[in-house]
From Swiss-Prot:
Residues 162-259 form the SH2 domain. SUPFAM superfamilies: Protein kinase-like (PK-like) (SSF56112), SH2 domain (SSF55550), SH3-domain (SSF50044). One of its GO terms (molecular function) is signaling receptor binding. Its EC number is 2.7.10.2. This is Tyrosine-protein kinase Src64B. Tyrosine-protein kinase that may play a role in the development of neural tissue and smooth muscle. May contribute to tyrosine phosphorylation of Dscam1, a cell surface receptor involved in targeting of growing axons during eye morphogenesis. Phosphorylated. The active site is at D404. It comes from the Eukaryota.
Amino acid sequence: MGNKCCSKRQDQELALAYPTGGYKKSDYTFGQTHINSSGGGNMGGVLGQKHNNGGSLDSRYTPDPNHRGPLKIGGKGGVDIIRPRTTPTGVPGVVLKRVVVALYDYKSRDESDLSFMKGDRMEVIDDTESDWWRVVNLTTRQEGLIPLNFVAEERSVNSEDWFFENVLRKEADKLLLAEENPRGTFLVRPSEHNPNGYSLSVKDWEDGRGYHVKHYRIKPLDNGGYYIATNQTFPSLQALVMAYSKNALGLCHILSRPCPKPQPQMWDLGPELRDKYEIPRSEIQLLRKLGRGNFGEVFYGKWRNSIDVAVKTLREGTMSTAAFLQEAAIMKKFRHNRLVALYAVCSQEEPIYIVQEYMSKGSLLDFLREGDGRYLHFEDLIYIATQVASGMEYLESKQLIHRDLAARNVLIGENNVAKICDFGLARVIADDEYCPKQGSRFPVKWTAPEAIIYGKFSIKSDVWSYGILLMELFTYGQVPYPGMHSREVIENIERGFRMPKPTNHYFPDNIYQLLLQCWDAVPEKRPTFEFLNHYFESFSVTSEVPYREVQD
């Protein structure tokens, strides 16, 4: 006996949605049972999909294409109950198969994950893991785990090549101004000021100014849709982008191509290591020495001959194994896009390895003194200052003090991406302060006076260190307190001495006054990292050309 697929009311709603005859009950899935024309049930049927010859979803039964929220965990995200776009109410029991689309190519790293190509469509089977989902590739029919941040819900705005979810204006400028991008390269990003709006950023060129980026506000309509100029409105972001890709319509230039997206952050070497991070030493190849740290050497290497990694080693006898592994535990626990990611450790024999994210440009200090950082413009330095403040704001929120914040402990990657590293002296604190054991070494020129004299470290002593880092940054790697030994520094600071404003580099008065606030003798009077991050985020915006308006 055939299964009864739906009520009379459901039939009526679907028929009203498609009065021209586009609706066929046999083409849709209700509840968990697919109903074919013979009335038989098929539990293996494709849920919520109109079965056309191409095998793709009918656009009337897809989620809102401008849904921009992050992919949700545990089946709570996405759209489970769907309805025809032309009807005000849904049809109970109509279920949409959850499909994601690949935003990047991905190569399998172990036996449990799945290789895929950009554009591949995959059905989600299990979304309970926070970083890895189990899927079936709808092209190859292979099943396996995939990294969540490499995919987006199909037909959502996140799946568009031109949409950048977590990009601020300064970062948009850096991405668009890459040399390989022609005039008209563009991206769309969420507005920093309007929670329902967006911003369109376009690379342009003018005589006397050269290449630069123009920004336009995309404003929402009350009844749905978007506009840049009031005489041109569009039902979706996709429609808006398509229109301005055919005609500039008052923009500085026609939208020529989407800005290339950087690869997303990977927090694990592979899904097998998401819950454990001890790996065999034989899987690591040390290829090139990068430098020497407080407790050992740092190498560039490969994991399983495929993945770039940085490997920090512990010299025997310089630090206890337990303390070294404590550093690893801290780095693994805290995740932020401005902190260097820890991948794994090799602790079964000496020397112990910490395997972490590789940053191609090395330390900020070397970058400023010897690398491409020597040629950075002032706005580039502001961008780096903002990123470091963002990472420290995160540590501040987690009650974690760094205790060794300096340019040598910030790493630089492509597009001047900056990340904080070296938690060798960091400690998680339950109170506001941490007092180290006697005999602990710390860098005097970067250390707050209360930490030098009384051994009391807090997030406010990190703020002091951040002020010293800013001096390093804006002087392109100059040594703090030039010509002074550590003892002289301590004595002078106690007498109220502070480094003067440099005269051999561009150094605005307002930034120097901010440094003096970071160096206040009273820790409680120093600014928070939340304030510092907001200050530098706003700094470049207020000094740049405002958002453009397109004339009606």
